[in-house]
């Protein structure tokens, strides 16, 4: 007989951990199941991203309303959270550059969108001001987005985990969900523990926040689940700023004008290959150091485990960084790769109840800006699906 439990959450990435923390305010018993051996040392995809706290100017409210809303809310919530707990986070801002007239026209679109999304402080800057901020960046025009920042993702996930654990959340690491079912109107979960033993548990409510596995799990209870995913790998490189004069860089996020591209899995929005300062250990503390990330370069892959061996040559990054002309392929060394699941033909996040069991909530396609949006997503889940204790 399956053991009855309170709330079950599948997935110990940043979204799952934030949901656990948010629900711990009202729910008495919460179990989070994570198939990896741990959560706090960068074991999950959440730690393999650029570490940018996005401001929210890339997402229109017509086709991507959840991303538009949660990115702006999440940016503010992360800023408050990191300040409160003295986490490695700096509001370094972002400069979005245009290198030709067509891109310059798109800056107006993003400036208008920043107003619609209520992103504070966004403005055009002159070439003179751009030169004062980042002398080695070349562009005909630019936007300054001051609320964007950078954080060290693993440290943030660790803090959310510790807070949730202190609130009584039970984190079952090394425990994989291998089947889902519905019995008598209630969710039923088949789990395999780290020692190989298998068991069934019956939660009162289930939150599927399994990241790249979310759609596969949804199909276990709904063969006709309407969404499909493509696995997208993002590769990045790095260089050392100041290695020579052309590589001097003051640490502002530098982004190209976003593009919408046609791919085998549909239209995809991409923020492009950008420059982002990285955290290093400086005098025994995690601080912004001299390492600069260049990326990501996106490639569709077949396996969620295909992120170890570099797939992109340095020269391919240089093709996308004309706004930083002093950078050469020989300056670049491999950094890291990560996998995200993007929904085919659905540019927004998906957050909703299972069609056959309203006690199951699925979160799918939580790609960029998923990390930034995580605290806002968690609040939304609590307010919309857990109104009663």
For each feature predicted by the language model, list its residue ranges.
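N-terminal Rossmann-like FAD-binding beta1-loop-alpha1 element of flavoenzymes
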Residues: 5-32
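Conserved Rossmann-like nucleotide-cofactor binding loop
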Residues: 15, 38, 213
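Flavin-dependent oxidoreductases
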Residues: 18, 180-185, 189-295, 301-308
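Glycine-rich FAD pyrophosphate-binding loop
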Residues: 25-46
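Dinucleotide-binding Rossmann-like beta1-alpha1 core, especially the glycine-rich loop
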Residues: 51-129, 270-273
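Short beta-strand to alpha-helix junction loop
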Residues: 62, 66-72, 97-106, 144-162, ...
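Helical element adjacent to the flavin cofactor pocket in flavoenzyme catalytic cores
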Residues: 143-205, 209, 375
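C-terminal catalytic lobe of FAD-dependent flavoproteins
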Residues: 307-389
